[in-house]
């Protein structure tokens, strides 16, 4: 009989969102007439920008002709999309990123997991707490952790608390780590990092020869012009950071699938024999072996994000969701709940009422208001006593959800 990867058996029972789905399905079975409003999983609801749809329709027409047909594309992405990303996402913000340092993919969730393919087994790893569960679970799956403790934390990982007491700012550790996961604007707390805070992280990484894995999937939601959108806005970050970005939330590509990862060519790691090796070449080799690229049609749609029409339409989408976030913040604050985030990110991070833990508040809102959110404890032990609501829904449903919650 074939042997399995035993590391999967160390995973806690049920990934957060499948557990939410299980509870919601049980409720819906028992209450088939209930009109549920889902503000849990961060999936967008508004249609794709028209510029992207038009570009994909043209690409489909191209593909129907002999001259315009495209088969396998470059595993790294088509040059015209990489050039547009470099110009508009990085060079426009004075970041020294070249098109060759950009790898187009089908999702930053995939990339933030798959990056472990090129990193060693013995790195000391730090994550923030609360944390996007994929960072932790992907390390568990490849055997980089020990067992789960009663607290929900895994042996072999170090956790940096982010809570109201420290202003949801991950404090720079005093001990050595090789690999650090950062996500700003943060999922799930909605907190942000200033340039000064990122400068301290880059300084730490350079002093410790550490690598920062920087998830900037929500950078487009930043409203404060003083806040950085990329870690590469910080001097020295090219030498110590990989950045993940996505078209999922800013342009609504959750079902269309397109993202990209940036690996500067100067970024180095060490081999088991202590030789310096550039990470760009390793990732390029990995992608060439395990990835066939994003479809031509989808990449044309992503390219259109950077057209004048696309930029205007994406800006309208961002404004729509951030207006939803403001409604959530103001309505919940009006009934005395403490609400964090929701100002530079599409997530509101709510302190649960006294006497309720995260899952109790989840069940309370599900039963009493028929509103689905995300329990903070599902993001780590420091998320206990908090609850996440997403701004990704229609205006009518957000208003109705707030009416229900403020009425119970």
From Swiss-Prot:
Keyword Ribonucleoprotein appears in the UniProt entry: no
Reactions catalysed according to its record: (2S,6S)-2,6-diaminopimelate + 2-oxoglutarate = (S)-2,3,4,5-tetrahydrodipicolinate + L-glutamate + H2O + H(+)
Full protein name: LL-diaminopimelate aminotransferase
Essential cofactor(s): pyridoxal 5'-phosphate
GO biological process: lysine biosynthetic process via diaminopimelate, diaminopimelate-aminotransferase pathway
Quaternary assembly: Homodimer.
Gene3D superfamilies, alphabetized: Aspartate Aminotransferase, domain 1, Type I PLP-dependent aspartate aminotransferase-like (Major domain)
This enzyme's EC code(s): 2.6.1.83
The gene coding this protein: dapL
Keywords: Aminotransferase, Pyridoxal phosphate, Transferase
Transmembrane domains' residue ranges: none
Pathway: Amino-acid biosynthesis; L-lysine biosynthesis via DAP pathway; LL-2,6-diaminopimelate from (S)-tetrahydrodipicolinate (aminotransferase route): step 1/1
Molecular function GO terms recorded: L,L-diaminopimelate aminotransferase activity; pyridoxal phosphate binding
Similarity comment: family membership: Belongs to the class-I pyridoxal-phosphate-dependent aminotransferase family. LL-diaminopimelate aminotransferase subfamily.
Physiological role: Involved in the synthesis of meso-diaminopimelate (m-DAP or DL-DAP), required for both lysine and peptidoglycan biosynthesis. Catalyzes the direct conversion of tetrahydrodipicolinate to LL-diaminopimelate.
């Amino acid at each position: 009989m074939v042997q399995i990867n035993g590391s999967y058996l160390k995973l806690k029972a049920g990934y957060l969102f499948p557990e939410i789905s299980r509870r919601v399905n049980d409720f819906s079975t028992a209450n088939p007439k209930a009109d549920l409003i889902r503000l849990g999983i961060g999936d967008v609801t508004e249609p794709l920008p028209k510029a992207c749809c038009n570009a994909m329709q043209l690409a489909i027409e191209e593909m129907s002709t002999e001259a315009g047909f495209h088969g396998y594309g470059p595993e790294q992405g088509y040059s015209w999309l990489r050039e547009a990303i470099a110009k508009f996402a990085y060079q426009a913000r004075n970041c020294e990123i070249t098109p060759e340092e950009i790898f187009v993919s089908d999702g930053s969730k995939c990339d933030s997991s798959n990056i472990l393919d090129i990193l060693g087994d013995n790195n000391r790893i730090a994550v923030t707490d609360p944390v996007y569960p994929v960072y932790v679970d992907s390390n568990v799956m490849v055997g980089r952790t020990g067992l789960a403790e009663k607290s929900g934390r895994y042996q072999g990982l170090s956790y940096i608390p982010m809570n109201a007491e420290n202003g949801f700012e991950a404090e720079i550790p005093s001990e050595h780590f090789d690999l650090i996961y950062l996500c700003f604007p943060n999922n799930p707390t909605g907190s942000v990092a200033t340039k000064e805070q990122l400068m301290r992280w880059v300084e730490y990484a350079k002093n410790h020869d550490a690598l920062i894995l920087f998830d900037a999937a929500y950078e487009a939601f930043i409203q404060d012009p003083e806040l950085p959108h990329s870690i590469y806005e910080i001097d020295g970050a090219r030498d110590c950071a990989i950045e993940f970005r996505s078209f999922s939330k800013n342009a609504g590509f959750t079902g269309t699938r397109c993202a990209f990862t940036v690996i500067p060519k100067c970024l180095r790691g060490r081999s088991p024999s202590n030789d310096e090796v550039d990470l760009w070449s390793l990732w390029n080799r990995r992608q060439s072996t395990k990835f066939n690229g994003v479809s031509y049609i989808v990449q044309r749609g992503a390219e259109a994000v950077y057209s004048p029409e696309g930029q205007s339409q994406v800006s309208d989408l961002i404004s729509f969701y951030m207006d939803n976030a403001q409604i959530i913040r103001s309505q919940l604050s009006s009934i005395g709940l403490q609400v964090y985030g929701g100002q530079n990110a599409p997530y509101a991070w709510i302190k649960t009422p006294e006497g309720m833990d995260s899952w109790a508040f989840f069940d309370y809102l599900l039963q009493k208001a028929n509103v689905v959110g995300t329990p903070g404890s599902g993001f780590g032990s420091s998320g206990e006593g908090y609850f996440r609501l997403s701004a990704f829904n229609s205006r009518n449903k957000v208003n109705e959800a707030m009416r229900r919650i403020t009425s119970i």
